Amino acid sequence: MEQKKLSQKKTVSFITLGCKVNQYDSDAMRTLFVRNGYSPAEGDDADVYVINTCSVTSVGDRKSRQMVRRIRRAHPDAIIAVAGCYAQLAPEVFEKMGDVDVIVGHQNRTHIVEYVEKARTAEQPLNEVVDIMKVKDFENMEVDPEGEVKTRAFIKVQEGCDNYCTFCIIPYARGKLKSRKQEDAVSEIRKLVARGYREVVLTGIHLGNYGKDLHDGTSLSSLVSELVKIPDLLRIRLGSIESVELSEELIRIIQNEPKVCRHLHLPIQSGSDSVLKGMNRHYRLAKYKALITELRDKIPGLALTTDLIVGFPGETEENFKETLETLKEIRFSGIHVFPYSQRTGTPAATYPDQVSNEVKKERVHRVQELEKGIAKDYRDQFLGKVVHVLAEEVKNGWYEGLTDEYIRVTIRSEGVERGILYPVRITAITEEGMVGEVVTA
């Protein structure tokens, strides 16, 4: 491998594929580069490219490889580093490609700048991937509070998963449950709020189990209880949580703390008990529905969104119709639907009765059509009502922001400032969100 040259001004560019946890990891690694003298690249020309890969589906794998090849063709002299799930699971793929200089997975990312510098004179790609199943501690990184100030920050507080759903490759990519120390998370959030951030979204692979491995009383409830005490933090939003891990204490906090958004993302994955059993999901429909009823009774106006997989091995048309009926009954305000992806190394990949791609595609479409109508009905209830919108960014002369319920609202930008929570009267419902006007005294 020939020596890579460094321009006088060191620059780095990040390409992030996949989930919000990956986005946080990229932001944290970018912070490490900035603290070591690098500047974020302007435009499409950098000395170093870091591709944070995704492997949740085979599409994620393919996009990761395509991105490496595209960057190498366009920038033959740049250093290319890969991180993330695909790099963790299949480092040999990137070694054989010949286009990658540094390979890290989900550990030792705190040393990524050091690896990049070594790669400039290395003869072979540096493979720094370790056995993630042996890693017991959370790798603490943080987003630079001195960087670009936005309104909403995604903060990772937990890593890894111990559930081992039969369809999912992520436990093998991110390892066992690992929680961030509560004081580290609170410290980072305080710094970001001091810089002007007004909303934090707590994220993790298995967020509902946050703190269990620390054995010191830390929990998601204890963390949220500390965060509500931060004066200028206006909103706390929770990332995806498994329904079986939603504690009574956390429900009480959502019920009583105005800063905690009335929105929960509770993955259901299927509306058929036989499919849930095959997935090794730790609940059945009766339990899930009972929780939904309890939540709606205790927290009026609560928005509920979910994840759904269609075309799981053995899912019959009858099973799928059960799922559609379940969705009609629960009426989520939003559904992220995915076709099942056969991931080598997972139990479900070897199951008989794999569903064809054509059937999976058709079922995705049927769910999307159903969801479109239900989500529109949900938004319609807000027409003429006043909601609270945290102004985030200007687009074409209009400000955009989110309601408590995770609905995007567009408002005229005149007199509006970013980072302010405005009362907004909804004047129109659109295909993707709502339009409103600020209510003045």
Task: Show where each model-derived region lies.
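Conserved SAM/AdoMet-binding glycine-rich loop
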Residues: 80-81, 89-90, 194-317, 328
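Terminal RNA-binding accessory module
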Residues: 350-441
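Proteins enriched for Cys/Gly/acidic motifs involved in redox and nucleic-acid/cofactor modification
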Residues: 1-210, 264, 286-297, 325-329, ...
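Short, acidic/polar
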Residues: 318-324
